[in-house]
């Protein structure tokens, strides 16, 4: 019974725990227990060994669990520390890089602007010193030239040594460009409308066409158009009948009666061709012209540019228009 009392004695277990707590760190419980325990353990040798073995196993398991927990904690702490060290390392590098950049910029900033300012100031000073007087002279000359041009525009007077063309007073031949300039200058002098750039349009009343019966058409305002064009009715009548390929006459109401059915557009086209050939000038396109007949030929004389050119004679009778038909067929194909 003394052995059982020793096994279940709570004081002994407490003492054993207190004795073995400092040995947990050294992990040498077996050797130290044999040295530290006195003669009390020698009295009960067989039975307490089993209890000690059980307690030692329990303590070993506890130590292993504690060591595993410590290892896990150390592992996590190492990981956390590594992460922290990495972050700190990155921040330090960034700060060092920023400091380096700041140092470089501080070193470079005072040098470059000073050089640039020195260069710019030097150039400006040189320009001001060297170009002061020529600039003023050029400005004065430009102002005087502008004033002279304004006076020329107002007065219309130009001063020049040339009294005639460029080749006058010399033995050289004139050039093609000089002749062209002379021609255009004369045209501008004679026709001031061309200088302004306004193209004069010829306005004419539209022809009034009325059907008479089933086989005839009446050109009502024939005489009015002849007066607008300043042409004789006989000449315009001959051209109309030749172009339309019909016969007709003027009745008592001064209306042109034509055989056949014709529309207003057809007569307008004929009148356009007549105006282009026998009314407008071929050089300046002015309608102020006079049609004259000389030795079986008609001549068109312009009153604005005073040019004179021949006009085609009116051909009467049947004429084959094979050329026009061939052109139309070629275009269609």
UniProtKB/Swiss-Prot annotation:
Recorded hits in SUPFAM superfamilies, A to Z, give: Translation initiation factor 2 beta, aIF2beta, N-terminal domain, Zinc-binding domain of translation initiation factor 2 beta
Record-listed N-acetylserine modification sites? 2
Acidic residues composition bias: residue spans: 106-118, 139-149
Pfam families the record matches: eIF-5_eIF-2B
**Residues bearing the modification Phosphothreonine:** 31, 36, 111
- GO (cellular component) term, any one: eukaryotic translation initiation factor 2 complex
Query: InterPro entries per the record?
Result: IF2/IF5, Transl_init_fac_IF2/IF5_dom, Transl_init_fac_IF2/IF5_N, Transl_init_fac_IF2/IF5_Zn-bd
Alphabetized UniProt keyword annotations: Acetylation, Cytoplasm, Initiation factor, Isopeptide bond, Metal-binding, Phosphoprotein, Protein biosynthesis, Ubl conjugation, Zinc, Zinc-finger
Q: Where is the composition biased (Basic and acidic residues)?
A: 40-51, 96-105
Q: Where is the composition biased (Basic residues)?
A: 13-22
Stretch list, region Disordered: 1-119, 139-164
GO BP: cytoplasmic translational initiation; formation of translation preinitiation complex
The subcellular location is:
Cytoplasm, Cytosol
Write down the SMART domains for this protein, in alphabetical order.
eIF2B_5
Return the similarity comment.
Belongs to the eIF-2-beta/eIF-5 family.
Record note on quaternary structure: Eukaryotic translation initiation factor 2 eIF2 is a heterotrimeric complex composed of an alpha (EIF2S1), a beta (EIF2S2) and a gamma (EIF2S3) chain. eIF2 is member of the 43S pre-initiation complex (43S PIC). eIF2 forms a complex with at least CELF1/CUGBP1, CALR, CALR3, EIF2S1, EIF2S2, HSP90B1 and HSPA5. Interacts with BZW2/5MP1. Interacts with EIF5.
The name of this protein is Eukaryotic translation initiation factor 2 subunit 2
Q: Which gene encodes it?
A: EIF2S2
């Amino acid at each position: 019974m003394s052995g059982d009392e020793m096994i279940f004695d709570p004081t002994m277990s407490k003492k054993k725990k207190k004795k073995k707590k400092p040995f947990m760190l050294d992990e040498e419980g077996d050797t130290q227990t044999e040295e530290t325990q006195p003669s009390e353990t020698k009295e009960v040798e067989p039975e307490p060994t089993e209890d000690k073995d059980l307690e030692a196993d329990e303590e070993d398991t506890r130590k292993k669990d504690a060591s595993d927990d410590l290892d896990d904690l150390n592992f996590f702490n190492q990981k956390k520390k590594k992460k922290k060290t990495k972050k700190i390392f990155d921040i330090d590098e960034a700060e060092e890089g920023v400091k380096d950049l700041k140092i470089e910029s501080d070193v470079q900033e005072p040098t470059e602007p000073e050089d640039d300012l020195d260069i710019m100031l030097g150039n400006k000073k040189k320009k001001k010193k060297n170009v002061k007087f020529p600039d003023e002279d050029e400005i004065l000359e430009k102002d005087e030239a502008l004033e002279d041009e304004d006076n020329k525009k107002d007065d219309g007077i130009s001063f020049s040594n040339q009294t005639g063309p460029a080749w006058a007073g010399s033995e050289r031949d004139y050039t093609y460009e000089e002749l062209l300039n002379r021609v255009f200058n004369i045209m501008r002098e004679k026709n001031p409308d061309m200088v302004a750039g306004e193209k004069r349009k010829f306005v004419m009343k539209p022809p009034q066409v009325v059907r008479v019966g089933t086989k005839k058409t009446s050109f009502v305002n024939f005489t009015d158009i002849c007066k607008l064009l300043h042409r004789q009715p006989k000449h315009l009548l001959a051209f109309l009948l030749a172009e339309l390929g019909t016969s007709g006459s003027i009745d008592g109401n001064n209306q042109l009666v034509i055989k056949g059915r014709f529309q207003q557009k057809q007569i307008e086209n004929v009148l356009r061709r007549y105006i282009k050939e026998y009314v407008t000038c071929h050089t300046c396109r002015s309608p102020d012209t006079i049609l004259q007949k000389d030795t079986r030929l008609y001549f068109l004389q312009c009153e604005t540019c005073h040019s004179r050119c021949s006009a085609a004679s009116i051909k009467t009778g049947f004429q084959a228009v094979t050329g026009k038909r061939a052109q139309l067929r070629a275009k269609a194909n």
